[in-house]
Amino acid sequence: MKNTDLTNTYRELDRELAILHDQLESHRSFENILFLPTPEKIRSVREKWNDLKTQVENLDAPDNVYRLVKHHLNDFLDSLKFTIEEKEHNPEAPLLDFVYYLQEIARCDRRSNEIRLDVLTRKLQAFHENQDLILNLIHTQYGENEASLSSAFARARLDMQRDQKLLNEYFPDFTEEQ
């Protein structure tokens, strides 16, 4: 295999790993899709992860640069494995993390206000549309220990109440209707 072909193979695998990461974290092209750790989705992402792991393991690494990049890809696979496990065992995370998502969109995202508001609206709509599934996943994961989440949700509620007061600061161009 020519090094150009090998380099392209590395690039494609890097891209596929990034896409899987984006899917798990609901980033970029997946930002309007809420990743909910149903057994089917977890199975699907684990299959994808296993496929990518096999492809990375089978990569040629003819010199130190390729070995370094291959090592990086393996490290990234390890982090994705951890992310998959965290998503599976913490179905409440999207709800608890929303306050951080709001702050990221409000403070760090440099897209137009209209786009940022649209992204936030879609995310909230996805929570609303999937609330029964989310609650079922939480109940399935925690069962009788659901009460252990109460302090985390109470904190998240306080954070959201604080940020609700800052919405005018975050989005100064918006009207109440928006």
Where do the model's predicted regions map?
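N-terminal maturation segment of proteins
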Residues: 1-178
